[in-house]
Curated annotation (Swiss-Prot):
This is Snaclec coagulation factor X-activating enzyme light chain 2. Regulatory subunit of coagulation factor X-activating enzyme, a zinc-protease enzyme that impairs hemostasis in envenomed animal. Activates coagulation factor X (F10) in a calcium-dependent manner probably by cleaving the Arg-Ile bond at position 234. Expressed by the venom gland. N-glycosylated. Keywords: Blood coagulation cascade activating toxin, Calcium, Disulfide bond, Glycoprotein, Hemostasis impairing toxin, Lectin, Metal-binding, Secreted, Toxin.
Amino acid sequence: AFCCPSGWSAYDQ
């Protein structure tokens, strides 16, 4: 799934 750094929007954790 897609994840992102702190502050970003989580797509699919």
